Amino acid sequence: MSLAQMKKSNSLDQLLGAAQSENQSQEKKSYKDERLWKPELDKTGNGYAVLRFLPAVEGENMPWAKLWNHAFQGPTGQWYIENSLTTLGNNDPVSEMNSAYWNSGVESDKEIARKQKRKLQYYSNIYVVSDSRHPEHEGKVFLFRYGKKIFDKIMESMQPAFEDETAVNPFDFWKGANFKLKIRKVDGYWNYDKSEFEAPSALFDNDEAIEEVWKKQYALNEFTATTNFKSYDELKTRLNMVLAGTTTVGNVTTLMEDEPVLSTVTV
């Protein structure tokens, strides 16, 4: 473009048009997984739904996928939101750094490790029995992302603590149990303590209806596929950007879980 052409052109309109086009492109790229069901609280701050956990799909062994990740904001203002390589049993730069902070013996370092600790999530297929906030979800199969508290209730149903309780596989179509998800807000956080399983019962009275549900389930292996994780070096680069390169602390000897676990890591 010559100077004369530049003078005649309406650069403002061009810039605005380009910016709008770019924003539209970015909006199209933003991804919302429509397969995921999410609970919603009512005006009182409570949530309620009845779900049925579903068994593993054909070709997979487990009815859940287990995923560790990190989500924290660094001093730069940037966020580090990444899946942790510890999910795959590999070394991860944030876990190594957190271990170094924890082992320093300095309380302020431990506080940093707590803020940066990895978080545990599970994914399972569910059938929505009842959802008063969104009745259009009832009778449909979704993926459900949940944490350790709900997983503990699943394990308690399979491994009851008392002699008068019968073990139940909540993922079984015929001998499983509906899960009454009850959410309250306690100290600003969602609390699931009131949630419980109903008495065991078949999902449906006929196998044809059960098979229709089974065919609609989603594979879970994708959540722990290697393609779902960045490499160690990529994560390290991102971590340095978020923390502005201010995080060299000692040698690494342990991994962080919900609380520190004294297990040796080879670096």
Give the residues covered by each predicted segment.
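OB-fold ssDNA-binding interfaces and closely related basic DNA-contact patches used
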Residues: 1-170, 229-233
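Compact mixed alphabeta submodule
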Residues: 130-266
